[in-house]
């Protein structure tokens, strides 16, 4: 029995080289009549009568930034997706860490609603609670059960997927017809995959084991051997450019003259910022700079294989006659930094370089060479894809909004001006033996004992964007109740925290606005503009010359 059944109306071009045999065939999608009785997908608006619903492909990179030029190596991806469709210049994640962000993509929810707060089982990352409560309601599960889509997953799922305490590799999340998932975190060699619930180990032979290429090959085989009677959804989650930054052999000498960008916030002290940022050592040591330059270069090298993957997918879709009826999304789970505010390498922070991601989309009804400045977040991916499939967002409890009208060029569109960013810091209860001078409660202290995280690196922000304003307001849940506010129109590199130069009364209103977002759920998160109907926020008041005033203490609101 084959992993993927051969469609009866397509000639076979040789047996699948990369898909294993011996796995049980998935059940067929529900018949159309049953879907209609269940109130399923009724067809995407604007589709030709009698035409099949569109296919969707989502390619998800791991730790790929937008601010520091993360899309530069992906020339083919930009040409085949961005230039053939729409590029979003204001795409954000609600949490700058892998597992919470990926959970937001799958559920369409903010972290305070899906309750995945970090990359551990204790933090609800692929835990039994996640499996029981959230997985049945992910957008792929809805596509499968309510819309009759074939659903295919390949690559990194969640950081703790495959943990023995949460079902191991035998656990296949609800909603996936074909499951080809990596055990735990990103690797390029010497990893284990769950193939429809059965473990398969890979070694370190480039020709058969390099994970990005394996994902490309199994995805191409799916396109050749799937059923042609139903639409499909594919999610391909690459390891690149996540550490350990192992490039394919043919790309290991690329970008030899490339270094981490020396932008205005590179290797400077984080003045007037949260203590975790202030503890970074400025200037960085030469060894730290050399380390992050090498990391930056190697990250780009790994992305060249992702570029090849995208090219292969597009060409195969075109060869199979399916490209014109397929939406292709390209994005990342979070951004990254390399030396900004003297933090060597990581994500997790509230600044643009960590929370802003690439987002490119092509598909039916999207004009080529479009750029949108509309404020979108990865919680919008699920609602948008369900909208494409014809499933109403109001049937879900998702926090995000469908940006399909933006893709189709809708005019006079009422849209949000704010998204929420929230993060719960991680620390260690013991002192790091490599950094004995540091107290317990910190983590990710490398190199030179510069820490990237701590228990009280717990914060929530409102990111505000409109035609006139470009703002960020953040609160930390710590003893200081520290506040950071940035006017990104005047200060795009977030050098100047203006929290102490703003009227305390206005800060109080902004605090209340943040708490409204942190307590939202489902439809109340989708309300455009200001979330408190009794309050009209005027950003112009922020930049009046109030002088230096003492900021009031805010009421804390935990994630």
Curated annotation (Swiss-Prot):
Residues 1-26 are annotated as: Disordered. Processed by internal peptidase. The conversion to 3-oxoalanine (also known as C-formylglycine, FGly), of a serine or cysteine residue in prokaryotes and of a cysteine residue in eukaryotes, is critical for catalytic activity. Binds 1 Ca(2+) ion per subunit. Residues 1-47 form the signal peptide. The modification Phosphoserine is found at residue 548. Its main location: other. GO terms for cellular component: lysosome. It holds the Pfam family Sulfatase. The active site is at 98 (nucleophile). The modification 3-oxoalanine (Cys) is found at residue 98. Belongs to the sulfatase family. Hydrolyzes 6-sulfate groups in N-acetyl-d-glucosaminide units of heparin sulfate and keratan sulfate. This is N-acetylglucosamine-6-sulfatase. It comes from Capra hircus.
